[in-house]
Amino acid sequence: MITFVICLAALVLGYAIYGRFVERVFAPDDRPTPAIAKADGIDYVAMPYWKVFMIQFLNIAGTGPIFGAIMGAKFGPVAYLWIIFGCIFAGAVHDYLSGMLSLRNGGSDLPSLVRQYLGGAAAKVLLVFAVFLLIMVGTVFVYSPAEILGHMGGSKVMWMGVIFAYYIVATMLPIDKIIGKIYPVFSFSLLFMAVALVVMLFVKMPVLPELWDGLGNMGQKTDPEGFTDSIFPCLFITIACGAISGFHATQSPLMARCLKSERKGRPIFYGAMITEGMVALVWATVAMWFFYDAPQPGYEQIAGGAANGFHTSAPMVVNLVCNDWLGVLGGILAMLGVVAAPITSGDTAFRSARLIVAQALKINQLPKANRLYICIPLFVASFALLIWQISNPDGFNTIWQYFGWANQTLSVFTLWSITVYLVREKKPYIITLIPALFMTCVCTTFLAVSKTAFGL
């Protein structure tokens, strides 16, 4: 518990001190934002700051800081260090500066920013890469909620159809019609679940692995046959959304088009990432208790769940912990956490993909027919990937690993683009150069040495 409290305080101090330093480096001013200068009632819509924050938080979070932190907790207390240092010095910097660059460039999407700072060839690679990643995000976040809902009633295929139908509607409608109205509610639910678990941590005061117990790979010691991942680079791929995630750079332009002032960028972009880091920290702590100090070892409970047809272990951990610690309320919160949150992440992923394709092909998005023309191929590709995922018993975990690698590779493009911007502006580029070098090393190493990387 001492490590958990120290790490939580570190995230708060990181926002207050380092976040303010990064803000001074960028130097926001009072120029008109895209929400004002380019208002169109569809994607460029000025919204209240609190609503922009809640939507940004849910867009970048979803179940990423839950599932990723749970799987990363298998490595042991070393996961704490990646969450706090990654979040403060890499992830929040990445999110803030990518969001602010989008603001400064008329709400431009990530491929457009990469083209401006890294050149046309890099932008073309990123365009394909980003759309593929976003389709993969939508696919990953169809399967897990459909499986959970299928265990409650109805068939898994039926729930997949329902979720896809929602995706089509949410992707095409103006951003303030569905996303602007219901996302803040789901954000509150996700935060409330994390706060409730923090309260229960202090009530139960469980014995937890601490940093001074050692930074070795606890997963390999506890389950040597079932857990074979190495700390480097696998930990830094597994915990993405709680530390740094390239996916966030595809989402920040959505809110950059809804922000009324540049000066609110730090609490919106940097603050949302720090908040996500806190959620990841909570779930990493709870998961470490589950795997290593619970009355019945977590690996045994997961094996029992798999025997009953529950193949995705991370959602199962959420259900087991929430129901055990929070009772009936926990079951409701778990539903919101592992059903609603991934669905909302999926629909904003497809929305981002639609906007990226539209901007690349210069297709006007005001006519509904134009939006539909882009959406149909995206959903067909996602459905094909989903069929493969269903046919493969380990499909979810395989896609999650590829999603994690693609996610972090996207962050590499973003960090190098921001570094070039800072060099051109004669600003302290070291704040993104070091994270860019580190994440480049992580992604190339994973591709070169991980068995999962060549699993297909």
Feature-to-residue mapping (PLM):
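Membrane-interface "cap" regions at the ends of multi-pass membrane proteins
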Residues: 10-66, 264
